[in-house]
Design a protein with these regions (language model features):
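Catalytic Walker B motif of ABC-type/P-loop ATPase nucleotide-binding domains
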Residues: 169-172
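Hydrophobic anchor residue at the start of the ABC signature
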Residues: 158
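Helix-to-loop junction immediately C-terminal to a conserved catalytic motif
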Residues: 50
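Conserved catalytic motifs of ABC-family nucleotide-binding domains
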Residues: 165
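Conserved ABC ATPase "signature" region
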Residues: 66, 118-139
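Conserved ABC transporter NBD signature motif
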Residues: 58-66
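Conserved ABC ATPase signature
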Residues: 144-148, 152
């Protein structure tokens, strides 16, 4: 699913690299927990995986596609087609309903639309299915998302990530605003959706206590030569 090899990334004007990763492999269908404290380069790595940044050296391959070989437009298309994201601030549009926010995950990807057509379901039907399975009831589905609790907004963001069956889900500190009970419930729901849609999960957090819930734990400190 993901292969990182001999990667080096530095921000402009920086004398030393932020990231220097010789090797990281993530298998298809794996649920990987990537741990690192604030400022360790976690978000930078996710930006590289999402094609938002490009490394000065080395390769990142996702689904056997070398991201560095793609131009900006093709990287944007690849991200829209194959990667669902759940970020700490959710990036929901406050004036839209949960359903309309979820549908945005499909609106910019013909591949995701084709994935749904192949299983004979409309985007709206899958949006409703995802929201129901993630605990957003029918009444809440039609309210503005700015009326929802943090936990509800988080589940809307998760539904948006999964719609159209992208192969990779990237979650960046999505549970930081939740208490322990709601955090564990959300992660369980995330795993259920990933299993149903055969998605790989890369979950990034500073909270090492979450590691036991995942198939595999990787510490960014252990693989990032720039931090040594």
């Amino acid at each position: 699913m993901i292969q990182i090899s001999d990667l080096t990334f530095s921000w402009p004007g920086q004398s030393t690299p932020t990231l220097k990763i010789n090797n990281l492999h993530i298998k298809k269908g794996e649920q990987l927990f990537l741990h690192g404290p604030s400022g360790s380069g976690k978000s930078t790595l996710l930006g590289l995986l999402a094609g938002i940044h490009t490394a000065q050296h080395g390769t990142i391959e996702i689904l056997n596609e070398n991201l560095a070989a793609l131009n900006d437009a093709k990287r944007d298309k690849f991200r829209a087609d194959h990667i669902g994201t759940i970020f700490q601030n959710f990036n929901l549009l406050p004036y839209l309903s949960p359903i309309d926010n979820v549908l945005l995950g499909c609106n910019f990807s013909k591949r995701r639309q084709a994935n749904l057509k192949a299983i004979n379901i409309t985007a709206e039907a899958q949006a409703l299915k995802l929201l129901n399975e993630l605990g957003i009831d029918e009444d809440t589905q039609h309210r503005s998302v700015n009326e929802l609790s943090i936990g509800q907004q988080q589940r809307v963001a998760a539904a948006r990530a999964f719609i159209g069956q992208p192969e990779l889900i990237i979650a960046d500190e999505p549970t930081s605003a939740l208490d322990a009970d709601n955090r564990d419930i959300f992660i369980k729901q995330l795993f259920e959706q990933a299993e149903q849609y055969q998605a790989t999960i890369l979950f990034v957090s500073h909270d090492a206590g979450l590691a036991s819930l995942f198939d595999r734990k990787v510490s960014l400190k252990d693989i990032n030569g720039a931090s040594l």
